[in-house]
Amino acid sequence: ASGQFDEDKISQGGLRITSTIVKEHQEQAVAAAEGMNEVEGWDPTHQHVALSSMDPATGEILAEYAGADYEKRQQNAVTQDIAMAGSSFKPFALLANARLGGTVYDTYSGKSPQYFRGMGTPVMNDGGYSFGNVTLVKATAYSMNTVFVGLNDDVEPENTLKAAIDAGIPEDTVGLNDELLNVLGPSSPHNIDLTTAYSTIANGGERVTAHIVKKVEDSNGKLLYSGDVAPKRVFEVEEVSSIMPALEAVTKGEGTAANVDSAIARLTTAGKTGTSSDQLSAQFVGFVPGMVTAVSMYQSDDAGNSVPLDDVGGLDQFHGGDWPVDVWIDYMKPATANLPGDDFPWKVESNRKVHNNAPTPAPSATSEAPQSGAEPTETPAPTETPSTEPTENSENGGNGNNGNNGNGSNNGNGGNNNGNGSNNGNGGNNNGGNNNGGNNGGRRN
């Protein structure tokens, strides 16, 4: 909407701007995000939470926590900060595989370490965890790097890249590439980009544009602008339906976000965690019918450079399945209370045939499977990083970019109903709430 109204028209006054923000959801987002302030070792002056919540059918942003205090930090964490995607990028390989006729019941070797074509350094799962042949459902639930690099080798990295862009990851995202390890998320999107891309999945393959201005009227009530956007089909319904068992496995059982299913038992839940290998960032993008929410966490020093999220809450390591999931639950549990239905209405039966049976891997040392919350990490070759961006390693390695200098815009909210002050860093009414709520759930390794 900002491009349709110049400064002269805005300064003349008389415009009535309505945002998409739902006051109750905004309050819930602030309470959930600022619950991190109660966690031992968490310092909101350097450690940041970004949360965006969207209606996947319309693209309307329902809530946005973009920083603790805009007067102290003039940076929108949702639309300007960037953080390494890590394993939150893996679903795009599942989509690429589905486009080629594959199924999430295809099997691959989960052996760790593994060497792949053109690589002098092996790919590893977190902590040296090694598995036998597993389906992509289990590999997604456990976030196995070796399996997903093997999958990416089969589907070809450029197809994973295309799936990500089609879903909603901008083509100019820092670190986005068509190399074999792109599946491990060396790219650094904005929080809102992940919300948008996962909304495409949650909407059965139709992509919508994220927006925070619902409508603009003049002083006489004449409609000057409407944020309504027509969805664009980028994946077939059957393709998206076919990958859902893998994404649903993440949020239950032994998945890296297993607490989600029991917390929101009334609705079908799905999503993916993501963590950088040096704990420079951690995030969880999860969705239910009618709502998608991404939670990103990262840390910067006084110079704006990314530094590890360590010494937080007594944990040795910081994963997407830890506090990002907790904050997601703290927000989504009340926010979804009035959503209708229990499953995604667009889902169809998928009768795909398994077309890949992995060879039996050579014997290797196998250790106990990771517990819920932990997810595998791996170190690929570094990617080039602009000097203006702080560097950050993906969950799987690579020098990417976190935090402070993303190339996004400020979502230019200007809305008149932004609820309470999550300090969205937008131009709108941040009605400064006094929120310190949000209880932090039990810790998981």
Model features per residue range: what roles?
Residues 43-47, 108, 175-177, 262:
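Short, glycine-/polar-rich solvent-exposed loops and beta-turns at beta-strand/coil boundaries
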Residues 346-445:
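Proline/serine/threonine-rich low-complexity "mucin-like" segments in extracytoplasmic/periplasmic regions
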